[in-house]
Amino acid sequence: MTGAEQLNSFLVDMFGRINKIEERTMAGGLGSAISITEIHIIEKIGAQGPVRMSEIAKSIGVTLATLTVACDKLVAKGLVRRVRSLEDRRVVNITLTAKGRAAYEYHKAFHERMIASVLDSLSPEQTAVLAQSLEKLQDFFRQEEAAMEGEEHG
């Protein structure tokens, strides 16, 4: 297997495992199933506070219709609530409930454990190389995403 094939195999496996483990970890912490999209919604709101529906949809790369369905599920699970803006009644913000805040903190702790487990075994030089490599991968994904958005609007 070439280096490129190994890297591809590693990335495909890693992305799949991260999603699967995140969903299972969160379900265990919440006591109910939760999708990766729902996790990302909670993460976005937890990091920023009350957020407009349209902003969340753009940030996590889903349509407003998809977000609405996911938010309906999160409301039913008691993790988020919809709040109309006092300044503009047309605007709906999504905010975390106390249970949603606990889910956000639980998810954040999972990520901290994941990163710590990697960094604990690397030298500062290896950490720098890993960060540079992941930054290049992130740049690729951003370029692909921008190209896709251009195709959708053009």
Residue ranges of predicted features:
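Short capping segments at the starts of secondary-structure elements
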Residues: 48-52
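Short helix-coil-helix linker/hinge
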Residues: 31-38, 97, 123
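C-terminal regulatory/oligomerization modules of transcriptional regulators
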Residues: 1-2, 6, 128-154
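N-terminal leader segment of winged-helix/HTH proteins
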Residues: 1-36
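Pre-recognition alpha-helix immediately N-terminal to the DNA-recognition helix
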Residues: 40-43, 102
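Short, locally clustered residues in the helix-turn-helix/winged-helix DNA-binding domain
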Residues: 43-47, 108, 135
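Helix-turn-helix DNA-binding motif, specifically the short coil turn and the N-cap/start of the second
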Residues: 63-66
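Charged, amphipathic alpha-helical coiled-coil/dimerization segments
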Residues: 72-129
